[in-house]
């Protein structure tokens, strides 16, 4: 015989309610919040070494400002991040500040899901428009209103293995890679490196894979060098110059055909091969620098090679935005601007991650200039090839993925450059005819 | 509800009882809490969604202008919508068949195993208790990875389980079957245990073999359960989203994107709530058709059996 358990229905109901209450209040009060602190909620997508450095900067800010508590939330990069920001902004109870990609600004409905930046408050914390790289500051506006505070630019760069390049006789007397101009010099350099590697492809980049954007990044570094553009200023006309676009694509195919680049590496494999000195060159964004240093690869970095004229390189920029809030607490708002100003003014610390500060005073700081190899490619900040300012562009956008998918088979030879360009143009036309969720004028 | 007027003090006991009975018969007061929640969280959003599907509203709630059937016209001309609808149908067929047959097979097995029944029950039903995120991440990161995954390691193969467009859907189905077959198994097991034992005894006396008993007693007695399981399974499979979103994100090359993910993509990631609502209503109509067809089928069967 067993006694029935001594729990009445009322006990159970009461107990569950108490538990629910405890759970709800547990959600509302984050650990570490002192009662007198102002809480600033900050969302970002910075992972790996970027994330570690950002976390350190947030910690340093907290030490200098004991009255402010920064609640740092790291979310998954890419589409899921922009989905969450939009949802938070739509609800009007969003984080106080968020990291964002500049090229995404035109697509998020600035003014509806994002709140404008208050220039007076920005001046109060010591930031002036003239402090920022002019083309980037310009792009931080949408319909004439400032919606973003620029933080950095992260251009395509060229990583090179110093040991392998030395063996191939490619380094100058200063130990740096001898810069190349035009197709022939670059091909010559790659052929020499190929010999040292025993015939293995000397160059790797993200060339293949699901949703790969690497081929887009390479193409949009090469093509703008000859002055090529994608869209007219207002985004209404395709302005692709077929000849220039095909020149860039044929060059990419030539790299694959001659075995100078490896068309079968996806993002991870390209970084792994360069890390293990199985390739002499890596074309990638500037953010791999910390990881490569940690893993002890003998490497340095320089600007993306100039092949078709200028030294342009595909880039996007990290910026800070204020997702829309229905009621912004003035005290929290002030603390938010303080926090943004702290991060921007300490851009030299951030540059350790590889990114080029868009805050111009930071570019002159001895701390930054001493960073090797992160300061080697700083001059690119005036040559960045940013996405056209239309709603379907930006990091991890449909445009990048469509163009990446169109050009990936060109490198491996499964598709001719002409077919690749036709596929890209068809995708661009599809994107242009798709309805903009935030039309410029109410129709 | 007209009988709920306050009864005068002179009411006879008989009348009082009558008032009480009809009051509890309606029971409206008791279901009001449920009805309020049902209306607020199901009926109202459903109607709101229908209205949204005729507008171009975005995620910020602006651009809310009436566009008539433009969203539906766009959806019917949208190859990615058709592709995702097709994927949902393929998944439904590929998953429902093994989920029903395997559920029955496992139930028969456990029903006839005479030792450690609790262990078999637990093993087959256990996975069903796991949340979708746990299941998806376990398969994504431990079983399917091409280089170090359990599956390729065991088979000694080099297969891109989730990366090959022609295989990805099968892999998703395999995971889903492992995860959810336990529910059908449990329903079948309960049904098996409620088949009266004397039928089998009588059959044994008549000299029926095990196969005869299965074919002529067990399967017919399970008919209603099978019908129920098929309905539940079809509806569950048509609503597939979690495991695909978590394991493949709809890829590779859109080979696994179900229609619900497409609605999510165009609505929450693409910010076009109006268009997403139209896509959702296309699925809604499909589910209503399946349910109606099922109802008709049931009614016919019930008439035949009576």
Q: Predicted regions span which residues?
A:
Chain A
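Extracytoplasmic "Venus flytrap"/periplasmic binding protein-like
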Residues: 60-132, 141, 167-169, 273, ...
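Short, well-ordered beta-strand elements
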Residues: 36-47, 68-73, 97
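Helix-loop-helix "hinge/cap" segment bordering the ligand-binding cleft or interdomain interface
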Residues: 63, 122, 140-214, 225-264, ...
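N-terminal export signals
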Residues: 3-5, 11-29
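Extracytoplasmic/periplasmic substrate-binding proteins
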Residues: 45, 57-58, 217-221, 225-226, ...
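Short, polar/charged alpha-helical segment
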Residues: 47-69, 403
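Hinge/lid segment of periplasmic solute-binding proteins
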Residues: 101-157, 214-215, 298-302, 370, ...
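C-terminal lobe and pocket-closing loops
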Residues: 288-296, 309-405, 436-443
């Amino acid at each position: 015989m067993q006694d029935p358990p001594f729990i009445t229905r009322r006990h159970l109901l009461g107990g569950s309610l108490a538990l629910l209450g405890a759970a709800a209040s547990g959600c509302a009060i984050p650990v570490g919040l002192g009662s007198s602190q102002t809480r600033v909620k900050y969302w970002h997508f910075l992972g790996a070494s970027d994330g570690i450095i950002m976390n350190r900067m947030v910690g340093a800010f907290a030490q200098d400002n004991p009255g402010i508590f920064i609640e740092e939330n790291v979310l998954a990069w890419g589409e899921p991040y922009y989905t969450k920001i939009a949802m938070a902004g739509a609800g009007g109870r969003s984080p106080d500040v968020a990291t964002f990609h500049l090229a995404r600004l035109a697509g998020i409905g600035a003014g509806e899901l994002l709140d404008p930046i208050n220039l007076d408050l920005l001046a109060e914390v010591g930031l002036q428009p003239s402090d920022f790289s002019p083309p980037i500051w310009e792009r931080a506006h949408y319909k004439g209103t400032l919606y973003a505070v620029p933080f950095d630019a992260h251009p395509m760069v060229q990583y090179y293995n110093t040991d392998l390049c030395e063996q191939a006789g490619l380094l100058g007397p200063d130990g740096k890679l001898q810069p190349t101009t035009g197709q022939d010099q670059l091909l010559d350099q790659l052929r020499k490196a190929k010999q040292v590697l025993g015939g293995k492809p000397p160059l790797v980049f993200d060339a293949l894979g699901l949703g790969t954007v690497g081929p887009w990044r390479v193409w949009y570094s090469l093509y703008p060098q000859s002055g090529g553009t994608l869209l007219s200023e207002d985004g209404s006309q395709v302005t692709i110059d077929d000849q220039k676009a095909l020149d860039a694509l044929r060059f990419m195919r030539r790299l694959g055909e001659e075995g100078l680049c490896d068309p079968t590496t996806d993002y991870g494999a390209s970084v792994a091969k360069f890390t293990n000195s199985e390739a002499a060159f890596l074309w990638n964004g500037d953010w791999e620098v910390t990881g490569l240093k940690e893993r002890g690869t003998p490497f340095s970095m320089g600007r993306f090679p100039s092949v078709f004229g200028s030294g342009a390189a595909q880039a996007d920029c990290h910026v800070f935005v204020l997702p829309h809030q229905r009621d912004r607490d003035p005290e929290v708002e002030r603390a938010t601007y303080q926090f943004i100003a702290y991060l921007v003014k300490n851009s030299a610390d951030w540059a350790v991650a590889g990114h080029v500060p868009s805050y111009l005073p930071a570019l002159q700081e001895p701390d930054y200039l001493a960073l090797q190899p992160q300061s080697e490619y700083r001059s690119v900040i005036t040559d960045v090839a940013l996405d056209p300012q239309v709603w379907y562009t930006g990091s991890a956008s449909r445009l990048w993925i469509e163009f990446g998918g169109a050009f990936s088979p060109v490198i491996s030879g499964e598709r001719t450059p002409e077919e690749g360009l036709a596929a890209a143009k068809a995708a661009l036309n599809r994107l242009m005819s798709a309805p903009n969720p935030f039309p410029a004028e109410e129709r | 509800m007209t009988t709920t007027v306050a009864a005068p003090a002179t009411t006879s006991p008989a009348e009082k009882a009558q008032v009480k009975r009809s009051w509890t018969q309606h029971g409206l007061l008791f279901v009001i809490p449920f009805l309020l929640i049902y209306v607020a969280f199901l009926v109202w959003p459903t109607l709101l969604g229908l209205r949204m599907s005729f507008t171009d509203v975005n995620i910020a709630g602006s651009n809310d202008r009436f566009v008539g059937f433009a969203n539906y016209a766009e959806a019917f001309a949208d190859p990615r919508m058709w592709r995702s609808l097709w994927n949902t149908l393929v998944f439904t067929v590929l998953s429902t068949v093994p989920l029903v047959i395997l559920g029955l097979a496992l139930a028969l097995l456990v029903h006839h195993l005479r030792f450690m029944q609790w262990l078999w029950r637990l093993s087959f039903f256990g996975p069903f208790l796991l949340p979708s995120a746990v299941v998806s991440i376990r398969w994504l990161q431990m079983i399917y990875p091409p280089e170090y995954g359990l599956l390729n390691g065991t088979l000694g193969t080099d297969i891109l389980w989730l990366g090959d467009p022609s295989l990805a859907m099968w892999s998703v189905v395999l995971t889903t079957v492992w995860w959810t077959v336990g529910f059908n198994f449990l329903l079948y097991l309960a049904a098996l245990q409620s088949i009266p034992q004397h039928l089998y005894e009588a059959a044994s006396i008549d000299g029926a073999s095990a196969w005869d008993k299965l074919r002529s007693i067990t399967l017919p007695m399970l008919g209603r359960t099978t019908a129920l399981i098929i309905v539940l399974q079809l509806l569950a499979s048509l609503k597939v989203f979690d495991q695909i979103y978590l394991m493949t994100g709809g890829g590779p090359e859109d080979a696994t994107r179900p229609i619900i993910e497409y609605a999510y993509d165009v609505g929450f990631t693409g910010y076009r709530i109006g268009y997403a609502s139209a896509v959702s209503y296309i699925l809604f109509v499909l589910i209503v058709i399946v349910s109606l067809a099922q109802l008709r089928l049931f009614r016919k069967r019930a008439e035949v059996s009576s």
